Structure formats: structure tokens, C-alpha cells
Amino acid sequence: MRKEIRWGDGPDHVADLHLPKEEGPFTNEHGTPAVMLLHGGFWKQAFDRSLMTPIAEALAEAGLIVWNVEYRRWRPDDEGVWQETISDVLRAWGHLEGLDGVDASRTAVIGHSAGGHLALVVAALSERRPKVCVAQAAVSDLVAADAAALSDGGDAVRRWVGSPVEGQATPWNALNPIGMTPQCPVMLAHAEEDEDVPIAMSRACAEAYTARGSTADLVPLPGDHYTIIDPTHEGWRSIQEGVLGWLMSGKSVG
């Protein structure tokens, strides 16, 4: 079952709540585990949460509560919206624990591409830490992504931030996951044939987190940038299995 919920006053302060049809093996006296989903699209207004609907449905069918959220994104006439984006994502994460039936001690965040970047920000900055963070094909190094001109126009990162990295290091460093310390275990899932965001970015991020003492697993998968959000593909099935295993046992993310 899916229903749209407004969690704020703005037009983008909306989310789709997917509920399992019946109580599954993960529900106990404390409630049901829940997952917040963050879509990608290089923080552009042209892309929305419908990108994550297929995996939202798959996770709900498996027995989880799924919170597929929208957030403010940049438009050609309204750039430099990073503060709004980060505020929205952290607020949406805080809203999750108050939803009916959610076991707040077993919540996870999953994001794809630019949403993977945001998921890593949640893992590092949120007051209530996730049980696990799954960053799929994450733009985990903003400086490297800008240098490589990732995205169709090659300038999506600096348009979202609102400035070039040259001479503006402070906001870039403050927003860059590779320099953060996640407060929960992280799965960096990445397709080996990804041409939109190279797997080398997740590999470098996993190494940086591990060097700082965080739990971070790089999970290379078959396929491309989009197969890992396709519930019929083996790449996504591997991710889902890992998430369900973690929420059930807490022993492994990879």
C-alpha cells in the first residue's frame, strides 16, 4: 500500500509511504523496520522520487516500511540550493521515526547516485544515527565528481553548490562525504560497469572511511548505473539481501 504524505510546507516536502500488506518476519513488539529512500539525478529538479518507486515496492513486499522522500533540487533559474537540500533530507529523516508502526531502533537510509551522497550525509550528520546506510553508486567525492565533469552538462555539482570549488573550499569540504565520518555501518554498492559515476569513487570512499575507523564495505555488483535500482536485477537483489540481513541480525552490511 502506498500513500502520499506531506511532511512540510513546501511543494517538495512530500514523500510516498509504502507499507507492507501484512506483518512480516521483521515486525516485533517494537514495530517494523523502516527504510528512507533518496533518489538521484544530480540534485536536479528534473528528477524525482519516482526513480526509487520500484525498489520501494520491493522492500515493502519484503516486509519493511518504506519512506521514499522528495527534497528541494536545483533548477537553471535557482542554483546553489545545497542548504535547502540538506535541511530537507535531515528533516525527512527525523520525521521517519514518528510514523505509525516504525521501530525507530531499526531504521536505514538508502540513496542512489546524488541520493547516495545525501544518504552518506545523513549517516554522518543526523542526530539519530541509522542502523545502516546503503550508498548506491554514490557521488561520494564532490571535488572529484566536479573535476571529472560528471552529469550530462558536466557542471551539476557546482550548480547545486552554487559556486566553483576554486576559492570556495569551505562549503565544498563541508558537503563532501569522503571527508566525513559516518556514525553507522556503510555499504557502498556500485555496479562495475557504471559509466555515470565510476566505481573508483566508492572504492576511494570505502578506503577513507576504513582508515578513519568506520565500518564501510565496498560491494561491487554486475550491471550499470541503473541496474542497482532495478528490483528484477541481481545487483539490487544482493543489496536487498544485505539490508534485510543487517536489520534482522546487525552482523554485516556486505
Language-model segments: residues:
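C-terminal catalytic histidine-bearing segment of alpha/beta-hydrolase fold enzymes
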Residues: E79, R203, T210-G254
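N-terminal cap/lid segment of alpha/beta-hydrolase-fold proteins
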Residues: M1-T27
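Short beta-strand/loop motif that positions the catalytic acidic residue
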Residues: T181, L188-H190, D194
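Hydrolase active-site cap/lid region
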Residues: V121-G167
